[in-house]
Each structure stands twice: as structure tokens, then as C-alpha cells.
Amino acid sequence: MRFRIYKRKVLILTLVVAACGFVLWSSNGRQRKNDALAPPLLDSEPLRGAGHFAASVGIRRVSNDSAAPLVPAVPRPEVDNLTLRYRSLVYQLNFDQMLRNVDKDGTWSPGELVLVVQVHNRPEYLRLLIDSLRKAQGIREVLVIFSHDFWSAEINSLISSVDFCPVLQVFFPFSIQLYPSEFPGSDPRDCPRDLKKNAALKLGCINAEYPDSFGHYREAKFSQTKHHWWWKLHFVWERVKVLQDYTGLILFLEEDHYLAPDFYHVFKKMWKLKQQECPGCDVLSLGTYTTIRSFYGIADKVDVKTWKSTEHNMGLALTRDAYQKLIECTDTFCTYDDYNWDWTLQYLTLACLPKVWKVLVPQAPRIFHAGDCGMHHKKTCRPSTQSAQIESLLNNNKQYLFPETLVIGEKFPMAAISPPRKNGGWGDIRDHELCKSYRRLQ
């Protein structure tokens, strides 16, 4: 039997099949993207703290001790679908960088100050910070970037309530929440914190070779903050699109800070004073932890001091030049055995930066630490009590706020400050390498 082939019919049939395939593919692609980016669905399901593990265990020989006995090996954890969807969502949001509360014509650009707030999971304090921002004069001119290491419906709702200034949310892509059962989270194959190194080598846990200076193994909950801070520093200066040609300052805050209503007014005058009378000042700080009761006689005064991590880590403002000098110290920052980002910076001022930092700081603080609980505290959180005390101080001194001019009150001798004894918690080579990698990330 002879078959007759009609080229026109074959061509038409081919085009019809291709069109049907494209429609099916594109509809599935849109559905997958919509599913991945739907906050209500993600927020309605709690993210589990660990993946699912197989019931049986294998046997492996310790690689660094040929004479060691065979030990059970914990299998590599599986990653549940919800965790993968969170990772996908974070990647997409960091790529899209959707600005809110700005004109949609594409002509908006940031002013002379950008705020970057490091946010974990303390919404009660974040609410106070947002309230203080809402009361700040001139805040409509300021871009506020919230950098998160925890996805939360409550926190996202709080950020959505910010309608008084431009807002951008970015997300630390290597958080414990996104890697709950593997590094940089807590891998079940990791060594227990207090296990001795010899015992760890015999056990064969994966980081047995890398305890910290005090013989302890890493704890992810402590490592994360330093990781987040360094990633955020690089990301906002190098990867936030709207800041690519930015020449102003970036003010770094944390979720438990509280700002005075004249902080921006004072900041602009500090910046002008720095340019005119202290060109050698490297950084600006909005205040210290010193308790004061009255702004009388000091509200218009700033001091020039040697930067000290335990005093000047709140409201730290950096220029691009200061950032570029810092980022050149990546290896030193990422290998220094202290899980505190600020104490590590103190070490950099001695070991890597061209000189010790000179800071310009107001005698009457325009920033306050509302968080009396958290990583370094064991107290019960009392945000309402703290905020009431701060508000009382500001109300009692409102006649001294918004000074017309600023003057340098005192210039202290510049001298290197020895960093406090390092705290450890940062001996794991995996932390070192991940930290270094942020500079290479696109």
C-alpha cells in the first residue's frame, strides 16, 4: 500500500501540536510561579524545624582516624517541599527587589540617607522601631530596607503597615529557617557543642576538626547573626539595584532599636559637620548606651572619639568608601573567632583597616536600645516597659530636640582600643568559607 504525504497538512499538524504544547507549558509555568510566590499559602503553613529522616542508619568509617571503630552514620537529611519553596521565594524576592511607596514612573532615587534594619523574629520590638520611624521628621525622604533572616506572616504584616516612606524587603538566603537540618543550620551530623575534640574525631561528626578557641563546636543560632550582618553589608552596597550609583550614607539598625523624632534632622547636621570640621572621621554613630536623664546643654554637641564596638555599634552609618575598606578585610572578618559582628569589627580596626576608626557621635543619643532580651540576655521581654521609658525621656526633653546647629563638644585623643577577649563560636571552616563567598555572589 502506498502512503501519500501532504506537506501542507504535515506542517499544519506540526504547528498545532507545538502551539498546544506551548500553551500547556506556559500555563504550568505560571501556576508554578504563582504557587511559589503566594505569601498567604506559605504563611498558613509553619516551616518545620527539621527535615524528614530515614528510619535506618548506615555504617561509615571515620575518615580521619583509620584505627577508629565503625560508627553509625546519620543519613543526610531530606529537604521538605515547603523549605524548598521558601528558598525559591527568597531568591525571587531578592531578585525582583520590589520597592513600595514610591512613584511607579521609574524616576525615584534615594536621598542622602538609607536605613537598613536587620530583622530576626521579634515582632514586638520591630513594631516599636516602626512606630519611632513613623514619628520621625523627614522620614518620607528616607529609603528603609528591612533585611530578614526569618519568614513570618506577622512580620510581613508589620512591614506592610509602613506607608510613610519608601520600603524594600530583602532576605538573607542562608538562614537557619531555609536550611533547618543542614549547614548553615544544624546538621544532625554536626558535633555536639561541648564534645571534646578527641571524642569528636572518634565519633566522626563532620566538623570534628574545627572547634573554636575554647574547644566548643558551632551553634547555628549564634553563627547566623554574623553571617547575616556581613551578607547584608555586601548585598545592600553591591546588589540592591536602586543603590548602584548611590553616594550617600547607609545607617545600619537592628529590630530592637528605637529612634528619636529628630534623628534625621540631627544626622544631616552631623554629616555636614563631618565634612566641614572632621574630614578624617570614618563613621557616624547616633548614640551610645550611656544612660542620661537630661539633654540640657548637650543636645547640640557631638564628640569625636575612637570607635569602640561596645559603645558605638547602634546606628552605625557608613559611606561607600568606608564599606569598600571593610570589604577588603573579608578574610580577616570571616576567620576571626568571634560570633559577634561588632567585636569582629573592633578587631579589624587593629588588624586590617588602614587605621583605627574615628567616629562622630552625639552627646545626647538619638538612638536607643529597646531590646532587654535576645541573644545576649536571659531576661523576659518587656517591650512596653522599655518603650515607655524611652518615650518619657524624649517627652521630658522635647524642648531640646531639633537643635538649629551642632558643634563639636570634645575631641578625644585617638588611640587603638584593644578588642575584648574574643568570644569564640566561629571556629568552623564552613562558616569561614560561606562568609567569604558573599563577596562573590551575584
Curated annotation (Swiss-Prot):
The UniProt record lists the keyword Cytoplasm: no
Lumenal side: 30-442
Source domain of life: Eukaryota
GO terms under cellular component: cytoplasmic side of rough endoplasmic reticulum membrane; Golgi membrane; Golgi stack; large ribosomal subunit
Glycosylation sites: N64, N81
Molecular function via GO: alpha-1,6-mannosylglycoprotein 2-beta-N-acetylglucosaminyltransferase activity; carbohydrate binding; manganese ion binding; protein homodimerization activity
Intrachain disulfide bonds: C191-C205, C278-C281, C329-C352, C334-C435, C373-C381
Pfam families for this protein: MGAT2
Family: Belongs to the glycosyltransferase 16 (GT16) protein family.
Function text: Plays an essential role in protein N-glycosylation. Catalyzes the transfer of N-acetylglucosamine (GlcNAc) onto the free terminal mannose moiety in the core structure of the nascent N-linked glycan chain, giving rise to the second branch in complex glycans.
Protein name (Swiss-Prot/TrEMBL): Alpha-1,6-mannosyl-glycoprotein 2-beta-N-acetylglucosaminyltransferase
The organism of origin for this protein: Rattus norvegicus (Rat)
Gene name for this UniProt entry: Mgat2
